[in-house]
Amino acid sequence: MKKLLIMAAGTGGHIFPGLAIADTMQARGWEVTWLGTEHGMERDLVPKSGIAMDTISFAGLRGKGLRHTVTGVLRLLASFGTCFSILARRKPGVVLGMGGYVTVPGGWMAKLRGVPLVLLNADAALLLSNKALTPIAQRVLFGFPADFGNAADKALVTGNPVRAEISALMPPAQRYAQHSGALKILVVGGSLGAQALNAALPAALALIPAEQRPLVTHQSGKKNIDDLRARYAQAGVTAEVVDFIDDMPRRYADADLVICRAGAITVSELTAAGVASVLVPLLVSTTTHQRDNAHWMEQQQAAIHLPQSELTAQGLADLLQNMTREKCKQMAEAAYANGRRDANAAIADVLEKLVKNT
């Protein structure tokens, strides 16, 4: 039996596409195992999917102070030995890194053991971890057309893996033709929520006359749901507030407009489904990945790029009042034209070509 080890940890942006690929490979008869950490979302999501998971304690190095950095270096060194043992025991025929710190020790130990390494770079810019591993990787797969940097001779644009139910949605022209009444807005803060969106949306909607307001579903993140419900109540705005959405295909199908961050997997889902969006990139001092993703979407006329520094209640209220279903449909069709609904199969085909019999 062919065997795949997936390396992914932390937030949904790394884990959900890994799970999508796991489903694809299992459907092809492969055995899939997972390398993650003890503290990320994968701790719950991966076992629930019936995938065996091994963990390391390494948790990244950047931006958390000298003490954390020193501790991180020591854990990184220890994790190399742990990864070597995991690979020896699992005997994968190919290793797939989904980006992020967990891929570094696992990737180098794959090289040491002679196991082919494939990297998925979800964003429009090359991730630091992938830059470090590119020299030893057989292939670097990109979610979007990009400056391939030092990966040019190994690069292949496959798109990012998304759930089959999202790719299978009706094209936007058909979906939007079925929509009527007030605009339906879906606000998605990601697996951890987005405080800037949680603050801006209730205030913006309060500035719109009640008879002109769109219908809103707002995903808050588990920690923020009580606070967000209180914000909407204080603003006198009716909204459906949920902590987590487990039926995203239906939510995308129902929405005229999505307001969200610009993570690579979110953008890939928006293009695969064909949904209009307002993208508010997360401000991170160490990377510009989300800004690059949002800029790319705006260039395709598939989204509105709204920098967080320009996110105000009045500005957002004006934007929403000037939005029409026809404008949303045009953005959605542009997004759909740039979607890769064959990404799962394209990535799977690469793995099939490189797998080493064990």
UniProtKB/Swiss-Prot annotation:
MF terms (GO), sorted A to Z: UDP-N-acetyl-D-glucosamine:N-acetylmuramoyl-L-alanyl-D-glutamyl-meso-2,6-diaminopimelyl-D-alanyl-D-alanine-diphosphoundecaprenol 4-beta-N-acetylglucosaminlytransferase activity; undecaprenyldiphospho-muramoylpentapeptide beta-N-acetylglucosaminyltransferase activity
Family matches, as Gene3D superfamilies: Glycogen Phosphorylase B
Keywords, alphabetical: Cell cycle, Cell division, Cell inner membrane, Cell membrane, Cell shape, Cell wall biogenesis/degradation, Glycosyltransferase, Membrane, Peptidoglycan synthesis, Transferase
CDD domains assigned: GT28_MurG
Record bears the keyword Glycosyltransferase: yes
Positions bound to UDP-N-acetyl-alpha-D-glucosamine: T11, G12, G13, R163, S191, I245, Q290
Enzyme class, spelled out: transferase
One Pfam family, short name: Glyco_tran_28_C
Compartments it resides in: Cell inner membrane
InterPro entries named in the record: GlcNAc_MurG, Glyco_trans_28_C, GlycoTrans_28_N
HAMAP family: MurG
Name of protein: UDP-N-acetylglucosamine--N-acetylmuramyl-(pentapeptide) pyrophosphoryl-undecaprenol N-acetylglucosamine transferase
Organism, as annotated: Herminiimonas arsenicoxydans
